Amino acid sequence: MDNDSQYSGYSYKSGHSRSSRKHRDRRERHRSKSREGSRGDKSVTIQAPGEPLLDNESTRGEDRDDNWGETTTVVTGTSEHSISHDDITRITKDMEDSAKLDCSRHLGVVIGGALALLSFLTPIAFMLLPQILWREDLEQCGTACEGLFISVAFKLLILLLGSWALFFRRPKAFFPRVFVFRALLMVLVFLLVVSYWLFYGVRILESRDKNYQGIVQYAVSLVDALLFVHYLAVVLLELRQLQPQFTIKVVRSTDGASRFYNIGHLSIQRVAVWILENYYHDFPVYNPALLNLPKSILSKKMSGFKVYSLGEENTTNNSTGQSRAVIAAAARRRDNSHNEYYYEEAEHERRVRKRKARLVVAVEEAFTHIKRLQDEDQKNPREIMDPREAAQAIFASMARAMQKYLRTTKQQPYHTMESILHHLEFCITHDMTPKAFLERYLGPGPTIQYHKDRWLAKQWTLVSEEPVTNGLKDGVVFVLKRQDFSLVVSTKKIPFFKLSEEFVDPKSHKFVMRLQSETSV
């Protein structure tokens, strides 16, 4: 496997003679041969296909020339990655955690499904058991009794559809704690069904009641009770949270991006899931490359002083006073870092405007060329291209401008060539304008717009001083953490407003003109 690795080459600059260069080449070849035996012990990272050619660190550099795409040497190969012992341990731990989460999630679904099936089949069992056990002793079921069968059938159908719509939905997240209201409803349904079964066993099964119409009415009463429980579930799980009661502020810890939301009565863990749902389409994508100051500012270091006392002991006080004076004078010196930052920002904005103008012109020309090809294709059917071929045909004319603009705005890690081609094909297919194509690249879009590998976190951690099953209260603060940043959430209760009414008589709107000697009428 190691022998299959290919290196693009190295460039050497030297002022020595040709013989010394040949000697150095032979020495390098000898060293490379001696390292072949131990090459398997070193980790070599090979860029996977489809990934951007620049990592996060390289995209931050501003000291590269504009022709980096033509002069950069890239090592290509298969998508092989090195894995250390720590990586294997971490992967094993993640697999164990995910297995625990899946088991607990499926356990709740199984319990809920079993309870729902028991509740649905219980009324049917109430009506079938007398027909099976003591059919000969039962009284005849009249017209009213037969009408109850229709009532039970439709009520069970409504209950089945309502339960499926409310409870059997795909879960949006895994909660760290039990959903209190849902668990309360499950306990209530369980107690209700068990109570009905106990009464049915004592008063009907043991005595073998002959009044079949009364048995059917008993089953109808259970179905009615289940319908009322379903109505209670709709109120507690859906309607209770619709009335806004709190205003929450969500701040991203790294760049300070913030949003405000109004929300109703929910537990902390459900609020956390609701915030994550809104985060992915409200917050711009997190780009760590935009957080750094220019290198010219970061490279500046504060001057340091070290004062030595070379005199006698009685001169200690004098040397201490002199050192303090020197340090104070250095501290009073004016720091010009803010000026450098200002000019760096101005230069960056100028470059962005310049690259943006070139990109807009290149895209406009490319789309105009596509329109001209479409008009010609109507006359020459043999030259018709599909959207993919058309996108590949015009991409070369805008690739350089797109590359420079994405690098200047530090968006290149989020847009691969394949994703740009796919978006261009989409725009051509639906007859979208150049502005519609550029909308994705001229500014940072919402997080969910990008590929999942760039924004989707496998797991968020909820950090809260309050129990996560508690409801929101005024002043509650909790944090949603992931590997590279966190969301800090603070809560404020919506104030109570008191309105007073003041009646104004329409007849009271009367005015008098005040005439003065200078007034012109």
Curated annotation (Swiss-Prot):
Composition bias type Basic and acidic residues, residue spans: 57-67
Main subcellular localisation: membrane
One term under GO cellular component: plasma membrane
Known partners and oligomeric status: Interacts with dvl/dsh. Interacts with prickle3.
Tissue specificity annotation: During gastrulation, broadly expressed throughout the marginal zone and animal cap region. From the neurula stages, expression becomes concentrated in neural tissues, in the neural plate and neural tube.
Cellular location(s): Cell membrane
TM ranges: 109-129, 148-168, 179-199, 219-239
The keyword Membrane appears for this protein: yes
Cytoplasmic side: 1-108, 169-178, 240-521
Any one of the GO BP annotations: positive regulation of Wnt signaling pathway, calcium modulating pathway
This protein's name: Vang-like protein 2-A
Family annotation (Pfam families): Strabismus
PANTHER family: VANG-LIKE PROTEIN (PTHR20886)
Positions of the UniProt region annotated as Disordered: 1-81
Start-end of Low complexity biased regions: 69-81
Family: Belongs to the Vang family.
Short motif PDZ-binding, span: 518-521
Basic residues compositional bias, start-end: 15-33
Top-level lineage group: Eukaryota
Keywords: Cell membrane, Developmental protein, Gastrulation, Membrane, Transmembrane, Transmembrane helix, Wnt signaling pathway
